[in-house]
UniProtKB/Swiss-Prot annotation:
It comes from Xenopus laevis (African clawed frog). Disulfide bonds: none annotated. GO terms for biological process: chaperone-mediated protein folding; regulation of synaptic vesicle cycle. InterPro entries: DnaJ_C_subfamily_member5 (IPR051434), DnaJ_domain (IPR001623), J_dom_sf (IPR036869). Its main location: cytoplasm. It is a lipid-anchor. Residues 13-82 form the J domain. Palmitoylated. Palmitoylation occurs probably in the cysteine-rich domain and regulates DNAJC5 stable membrane attachment. This is DnaJ homolog subfamily C member 5. It is found in: Cytoplasm, Cytosol; Membrane; Cytoplasmic vesicle, Secretory vesicle, Chromaffin granule membrane; Melanosome. Coiled coil: none annotated. Residues 175-197 have a biased composition (Polar residues). May have an important role in presynaptic function. May be involved in calcium-dependent neurotransmitter release at nerve endings. The gene is dnajc5.
Length: 197
């Protein structure tokens, strides 16, 4: 068994039709009739001493399961057993995407874009490093101040002067709530300061 060569995946999509003895443009009813006829002929209960009949029955069941399902049949007709394998791995809705992305022109486009961007380094620099280390950085609109560099010492001095300008800390705390405290008061609280009434 270990020496046996693994079966390669076909892309023609014809071998399942040959298992049932049909051609590619067979209808669903034709598939059903041929399946029933062959399933009765090779059923393991009718051939208990024949292991080849059991294997043939498994192949017939597999072929019927794929060809009776319209989605799987379309994938098989278009891409063969390789398409069924891809559908099993990535989902039936992603089969077309897989084959488009694995086509020669998609690979060539990917390699061309990688080549002209220096292995996609420029794409990373544009997103992460503000366009080629700032050389191609978009200019701010007229009238807006440009970002200027502020040294840490100047920033610290500004923070200290802001702290000196403010008054002392707020020392008055709100009254603590007790069981007799009303949850809603009749008077409306005002959040205005004296200068903005």
């Amino acid at each position: 068994m270990a020496d046996q060569r693994q079966r390669s995946l076909s892309t023609s999509g014809e071998s399942l039709y040959h298992v049932l003895g049909l051609d590619k443009n067979a209808t669903t009813d034709d598939i059903k009739k041929c399946y029933r006829k062959l399933a009765l002929k090779y059923h393991p209960d009718k051939n208990p001493d024949n292991p080849e009949a059991s294997e043939k029955f498994k192949e017939i069941n597999n072929a019927h399961g794929i060809l009776a399902d319209s989605t799987k049949r379309n994938i098989y007709d278009k891409y063969g057993s390789l398409g069924l394998y891809v559908a099993e791995q990535f989902g039936e809705e992603n089969v077309n995407t897989y084959f488009v992305l694995s086509s020669w022109w998609a690979k060539a486009l990917f390699m061309f874009c990688g080549l002209i961007t220096g292995c996609y380094c420029c794409c990373c620099l544009c997103c992460c490093c503000n366009c080629c280390c700032g050389k191609c950085k978009p200019r701010p609109p007229e009238g807006e101040d440009q970002d200027i560099y502020v040294s840490p010492e100047d920033l610290e001095a500004q923070m200290q002067s802001d702290e000196r300008d403010t008054e002392g800390p707020v020392l008055v705390q709100p009254a603590s709530a007790t069981e007799t405290t009303q949850l809603t008061s009749d008077s409306h609280a005002s959040y205005h300061t004296d200068g903005f009434n």
